[in-house]
Amino acid sequence: MKRIGVLTSGGDSPGMNAAIRAVVRKAIYHGVEVFGIYYGYAGLIAGKIKKLEVGDVGDIIHRGGTILYTARCPEFKTEEGQLKGIEQLKKHGIEGLVVIGGDGSYQGAKKLTEHGFPCVGVPGTIDNDIPGTDFTIGFDTALNTVIDAIDKIRDTATSHERTYVIEVMGRHAGDIALWSGLAGGAETILIPEADYDMNDVIARLKRGHERGKKHSIIIVAEGVGSGVEFGKKIQEATGFETRVTVLGHVQRGGSPTAFDRVLASRLGARAVELLLEGKGGRCVGIQNNQLVDHDIVEALANKHTVDQKMYLLSKELSI
């Protein structure tokens, strides 16, 4: 294999640039040309493809976002769109593709694989919801962003003796809510993977108040429901002064943590190795701090599950 491509797709995550850097430098080290595909699958279809040199990925390891940009692309879900993409890859002499992104990006890589084009998926999403890996690129950075917000909000919650509801990202996965809530000492954590009883939430808040607790922090994953509506219900049911903070897209930005930079470097380099070994149709990950790879079709057939023991621990510690 003499020429490979790399793209980022779907929602951006801190550390994507570190992964791009690793792909480019690893490939060039082995004498392979690398082409950056801009704006994800939409850019692939449109032929927004440019050769990348070592200098193009200098001074980016610490930067959030993605220098290749990203975009949603409904057209690539169609066979016609997929064939247009393959036509562009062949036009540029690209023989293998590294796809950095989340579940939707993996679905695109799977389709290319089914058309006979070698692809390797690299997990890049703050949601940490990709099967076959303990951690995804960007999760640790987003987690630290949320924890920083929790710590600051707790300061003002204490000063004003208020209850605060903090809504975090996670439409289908509760990892950000669970991990940040546990690390931030939240009194209640609500995630999409677990049912909750509003009466129980209110009863817990009242018990804490009776014990002399002057403030509370509640973490709500967006997939559970609106943090604003949740806050209204709590104030109406308890009479406690309640405020709501929706963290939103701040969770996707920022300079990646050391963990995410190292993770991205390891996974990006391993993706190139797999292509050079002739192993397309794979996705890379890290499990028990060891690099692993899986068949991308089999990986997508599985479902990411939240750590139930950690969830139970969070409930035990928030009495």
Swiss-Prot record:
Pfam families: PFK. Gene3D superfamilies: 3.40.50.450, Phosphofructokinase domain. PROSITE patterns: PHOSPHOFRUCTOKINASE. ATP binds at residues 11, 72-73, 102-105. CDD domains: Bacterial_PFK. GO terms for molecular function: 6-phosphofructokinase activity; AMP binding; ATP binding; fructose-6-phosphate binding; identical protein binding; metal ion binding; monosaccharide binding. Transmembrane segments: none annotated. Pathway: Carbohydrate degradation; glycolysis; D-glyceraldehyde 3-phosphate and glycerone phosphate from D-glucose: step 3/4. Its cofactor is Mg(2+). GO terms for biological process: canonical glycolysis; fructose 1,6-bisphosphate metabolic process; fructose 6-phosphate metabolic process. It is an enzyme of class 2 (transferase). ADP binds at residues 21-25, 154, 185-187, 211, 213-215. Keywords: Allosteric enzyme, ATP-binding, Cytoplasm, Glycolysis, Kinase, Magnesium, Metal-binding, Nucleotide-binding, Transferase. SUPFAM superfamilies: Phosphofructokinase (SSF53784). It comes from the Bacteria. One of its GO terms (cellular component) is 6-phosphofructokinase complex. It catalyses: beta-D-fructose 6-phosphate + ATP = beta-D-fructose 1,6-bisphosphate + ADP + H(+). The active site is at 127 (proton acceptor). Its EC number is 2.7.1.11. Mg(2+) binds at residue 103. Allosterically activated by ADP and other diphosphonucleosides, and allosterically inhibited by phosphoenolpyruvate. Catalyzes the phosphorylation of D-fructose 6-phosphate to fructose 1,6-bisphosphate by ATP, the first committing step of glycolysis. Belongs to the phosphofructokinase type A (PFKA) family. ATP-dependent PFK group I subfamily. Prokaryotic clade 'B1' sub-subfamily. NCBIfam families: PFKA_ATP, PRK03202.1. HAMAP family: Phosphofructokinase_I_B1. This is ATP-dependent 6-phosphofructokinase.
